[in-house]
């Protein structure tokens, strides 16, 4: 609910790949690059509308924008973010603001660690807490003042939010402020959730944690997650740990269901994920294969280190629009190191006076607009509301939004469009439930007229997503066998009785071999002299 359980995608790249649109990488030479960009200017792919339903975090937005510079064809992107409540959308706005924070405020490593802290830790560093509060005040000005929004982040569009959702944004940003009455005892909420989930197994929870990781998540693509970081997250809610940091402040961006009660707030406590973790979005794979090295199941690098490396790449590309070269000395090999996990510190709320103000304009990303959509529109999309018809070129939907999927939903997709559905692969649910979910989803999309963008019948693998496309072209659906296999020389005649299985071998016919080949002809005579072949009957 508060983070996705699938890896970040470059949604534009997925679209190009699904429809086999040629988009050669831009050359490194500056003159050749300019010529290629001019040649791509007349391309008919001018605008793409992208809908992200229940993304829970801005991982797809960040990667899509970061990799935008690599494409020769760069259409205008309209990205629509639709989540279940205003607090999650406010959190997404904050995380997107961190990714696009002015470079004068933070260096690359500090920005990455700040993002990781706010993104995946229930208890955060004091510096992250200060940023959350100060940035919350800036975001509050943005959602209540159109001029301030255009000055700081003109790429954001909140016209799709109703006044109720804007009030929800205002309550979230206000709740983040360090006031004594804004209480969020996340450590207590976390323990309550864990006790309720495990029941009588709580006293032996370390064994339950190891089982979920070793027997489930690692078997489904989570090999990069180390047991120490996973157990510590399951115990405390702190996923990303570095030895030089101490965590003592509650991460109030995880609070949902805020309701005013005088100057105080009532909320639902912590209702997010407590089984998979925030490792999937950026921490499962990286382009540097050396970082996936492991010995007897012990990784050299943690999912935390992979997350750090990937975010440094994306944030560097967002800022410079150039390729990132990773400095190997920055990544610390803590995969097989047993870090001393000290108890979480107590925290004291303090006045907001004297904190830094993060009110500089965001990094400019030309040709991109991010629209925040009212959560109420999810029901309208399910019913096939006319104002959404033929709107989107790319749709991503989280697995927990599957109940909103219907045949009418696909009316919102254009004639040539891509649909990506997150699966339950990286949950700890039983294998049969994961397979049942995939089967139902495939059947629904097939009934709606969508065609698989990947040959799922031929590839017997584990799917983190299901990718289907809607196309107006008369294309043949991929089959399990893509090439016609040569026919057998032996054919059955439906009118012939071949007898019992033991006698079936008498129906074999040896083709006539030219007599010029004396060696083969001699072998043929020996085989015929031995009589018909019989199956072995002396089974143990």
Swiss-Prot record:
Annotated Gene Ontology cellular component terms: cytosol; dynein axonemal particle
Q: Where is this region: Disordered?
A: 480-499
Q: How is expression of this protein distributed across tissues?
A: Expressed in mechanosensory chordotonal (Ch) neurons, spermatocytes and spermatids (at protein level).
Subcellular location, in the record's words?
A: Cytoplasm; Dynein axonemal particle
A GO biological-process term: axonemal dynein complex assembly
**A Pfam cross-reference name:** DUF4470
What does the function comment of this entry state?
Answer: Required for the assembly of axonemal inner and outer dynein arms. Involved in the cytoplasmic preassembly of dyneins into complexes before their transport into cilia. Essential for the development of axonemal dynein motors in the sensory cilium of mechanosensory chordotonal (Ch) neurons and sperm flagellum, and consequently, is required for the mechanotransduction process of hearing and sperm mobility.
Its recorded name reads Dynein axonemal assembly factor 3 homolog
User: What species is this protein from?
Assistant: Drosophila melanogaster (Fruit fly)
């Amino acid at each position: 609910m508060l983070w996705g359980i699938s890896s970040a995608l470059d949604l534009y790249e997925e679209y190009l790949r699904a429809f086999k649109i040629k988009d050669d990488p831009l050359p490194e030479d500056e003159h050749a690059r300019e010529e290629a960009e001019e040649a791509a200017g007349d391309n008919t792919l001018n605008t793409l509308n992208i809908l992200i339903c229940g993304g829970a975090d801005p991982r797809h937005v960040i990667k899509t924008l970061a990799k935008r510079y690599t494409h020769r064809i760069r259409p205008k992107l309209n990205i629509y973010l639709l989540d279940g409540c205003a607090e999650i959308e406010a959190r997404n706005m904050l995380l997107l603001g961190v990714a696009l924070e002015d470079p004068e405020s933070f260096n690359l490593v500090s920005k990455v660690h700040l993002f990781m802290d706010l993104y995946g830790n229930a208890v955060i560093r004091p510096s992250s807490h200060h940023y959350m509060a100060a940035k919350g005040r800036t975001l509050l000005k943005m959602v209540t003042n159109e001029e301030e929004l255009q000055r700081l982040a003109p790429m954001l569009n909140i016209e799709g939010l109703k006044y109720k959702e804007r009030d929800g944004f205002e309550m979230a940003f206000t709740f983040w402020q360090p006031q004594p009455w804004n209480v969020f005892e996340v450590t207590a909420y976390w323990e309550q959730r864990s006790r309720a989930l495990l029941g009588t197994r709580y006293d032996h929870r370390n064994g339950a944690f190891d089982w979920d990781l070793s027997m489930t998540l690692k078997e489904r693509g989570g090999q990069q997650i180390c047991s120490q970081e996973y157990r510590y997250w399951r115990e405390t809610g702190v996923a990303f740990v570095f030895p030089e940091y101490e965590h003592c402040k509650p991460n109030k961006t995880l609070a949902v269901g805020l309701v005013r009660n005088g100057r105080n707030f009532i909320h639902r406590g912590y209702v997010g994920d407590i089984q998979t973790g925030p490792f999937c979005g950026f921490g499962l794979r990286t382009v540097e294969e050396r970082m996936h090295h492991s010995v007897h199941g012990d990784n050299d690098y943690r999912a935390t280190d992979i997350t750090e490396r990937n975010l440094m790449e994306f944030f560097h590309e967002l800022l410079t629009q150039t390729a990132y070269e990773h400095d190997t000395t920055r990544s610390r090999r803590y995969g097989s190191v047993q870090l001393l996990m000290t108890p979480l510190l107590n925290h004291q709320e303090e006045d907001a006076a004297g904190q830094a103000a993060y009110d500089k304009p965001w990094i400019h990303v030309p040709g991109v607009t991010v629209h925040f959509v009212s959560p109420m529109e999810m029901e309208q999309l399910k019913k096939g509301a006319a104002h959404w018809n033929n709107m989107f070129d790319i749709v991503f939907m989280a697995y927990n939004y599957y109940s909103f999927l219907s045949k009418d939903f696909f009316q919102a997709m254009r004639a040539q469009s891509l649909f990506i559905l997150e699966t339950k692969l990286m949950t700890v649910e039983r294998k049969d439930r994961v397979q049942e979910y995939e089967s139902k989803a495939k059947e629904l999309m097939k009934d709606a007229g969508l065609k698989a963008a990947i040959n799922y019948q031929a590839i017997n693998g584990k799917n983190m997503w299901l990718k289907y496309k809607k196309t107006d072209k008369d294309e043949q659906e991929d089959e399990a066998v893509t090439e016609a296999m040569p026919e057998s020389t032996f054919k059955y005649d439906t009118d012939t009785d071949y007898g019992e299985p033991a006698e079936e071998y008498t129906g074999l016919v040896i083709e006539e071999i030219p007599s010029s080949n004396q060696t083969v002809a001699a072998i043929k005579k020996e085989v015929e002299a031995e009589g018909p072949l019989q199956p072995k009957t002396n089974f143990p």
